[in-house]
Amino acid sequence: MAAGAVCRSCKVRVPKEVYEAAYVAGLLHDLGAIALTQWFPEESFAAHVAIREHGGTASAYELEMWGIEHGEVGGLLAERWSIPVSIQQAIMHHHQPWLVGPEHRTLVRVIHIADFICNNLGFGRDESVFPNWFDPEAWDALGLSIEDSQSIISQVRAAADKSIVLTKVLVQ
């Protein structure tokens, strides 16, 4: 939902294939974090506690504990499952969009910004685990402004509210 809001707000033309891939990439971008949590639940919990108490990022703790961070794990899983390369790149590099070649950069930037916005709104795994940081070059390259951020945030909140209502209806 956030990736779609970012795409709609971009002042630069977002190619149709990027717009379509953004939804799937937005859903799958933290695939590696889910896998690491499933494979190493105790270590993952300890990392979250350490981040709350001492600061730092999930990626830094993942690298320290396992020598690999969740983006890379997710990218490797996506490759193994033959998920399209553009989505693999978004999963792998959503925290480092500058590492991606030009052919996938727009999608990765969209997911990077959507991830940043969702985490800072508290829609991430744990908003206290993530720094309030994003790559300003990604923001600028998509032609986004401060005013756009307010619109994106409103769209994400509205979509989240709809999701909550739908979930309540489905659970009843």
How would you name each of these model-derived features?
Residues 1-172:
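Metal-dependent nucleotide-binding catalytic modules
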